[in-house]
From Swiss-Prot:
The lineage of its organism: Bacteria, Pseudomonadati, Pseudomonadota, Gammaproteobacteria, Vibrionales. GO terms for molecular function: oxidoreductase activity, acting on NAD(P)H, quinone or similar compound as acceptor. It is an enzyme of class 7 (translocase). It comes from Aliivibrio fischeri (strain ATCC 700601 / ES114) (Vibrio fischeri). InterPro entries: NqrD, NqrDE/RnfAE. It is a multi-pass membrane protein. Keywords: Cell inner membrane, Cell membrane, Ion transport, Membrane, NAD, Sodium, Sodium transport, Translocase, Transmembrane, Transmembrane helix, Transport, Ubiquinone. Composed of six subunits; NqrA, NqrB, NqrC, NqrD, NqrE and NqrF. It catalyses: a ubiquinone + n Na(+)(in) + NADH + H(+) = a ubiquinol + n Na(+)(out) + NAD(+). It holds the Pfam family Rnf-Nqr. One of its GO terms (cellular component) is plasma membrane. This is Na(+)-translocating NADH-quinone reductase subunit D. It comes from the Bacteria. NCBIfam families: nqrD, PRK09292.1, PRK12405.1.
């Protein structure tokens, strides 16, 4: 049974020490696409966390009964089933957000973070640590998404979670929204800035020169 210290490490390490986006540069496409609003970024975070945690759990449970030759196919079948569940739940209860997220919910199937943790961790670990690892990597993914979405929504529309925070010129205020922040390139540069800032704080993450 994993100790409380191991659980804490598994949950917190992917946030800064081994972030799937900032360090491993995985899952960047969705990070560019769904971060125009905090609302969509938050829902995407929950979706990826749900799929990663449960796919890790199920893969770990059957890892000793899975032929090596078909393990990738089995992993993808598990992940695809979970993504279908998420997609249907969003369409049933959060239809507007589901429309905004568009195809990116379905593309969780191809998210390198989900497949990577199933193959690299769940195939070699017990079910509970695998489940916790999935939650931790979902949080690490969400940390980047929420940070990027915070600046994009605030500077791009003057709002947070759809609520006006900066007085807009159109409403007699002083802030003119920066439309550039709502375009995908702004997310690319914000993620790049985050990677730079994290590696300033943690120089051990800088790749060694060849």
């Amino acid at each position: 049974m994993a100790s409380a210290k191991d659980i804490k490490k598994s949950i917190l390490a992917p946030v800064l020490d081994n972030n799937p986006i900032a360090l491993q540069v995985l899952g960047v496409c969705s990070a560019l696409a769904v971060t125009t609003k905090l609302e969509t970024a938050f829902v995407m975070t929950l979706a990826v966390m749900f799929v990663t945690a449960l796919s890790n759990l199920f893969v770990s449970l059957i890892r000793n009964h899975m032929p090596n030759s078909v393990r990738i196919i089995v992993q993808m079948a598990i992940i695809a089933s979970l993504v279908i569940v998420v997609d249907q739940v969003l369409k049933a209860y959060l239809y507007d957000i589901s429309k905004q997220l568009s195809v990116f919910v379905s593309l969780i199937i191809t998210n390198c973070i989900v497949m990577g943790r199933a193959e690299a961790f769940a195939m070699k670990s017990a079910p509970f640590p695998s489940f916790i690892d999935g939650i931790g990597n979902g949080l690490g993914y969400g940390f980047v998404l929420m940070t990027v979405a915070f600046f994009r929504e605030l500077l791009g529309s003057g709002k947070l979670f759809g609520v006006e925070v900066l007085p807009l010129v159109s409403n007699g205020g002083w802030y003119q929204p920066n439309g550039l922040m709502l375009l995908a390139p702004s997310a690319f540069f914000l993620i790049g800035f985050m990677i730079w800032a994290i590696r300033i704080l943690k120089p051990e993450q800088v790749e060694a020169k060849e």
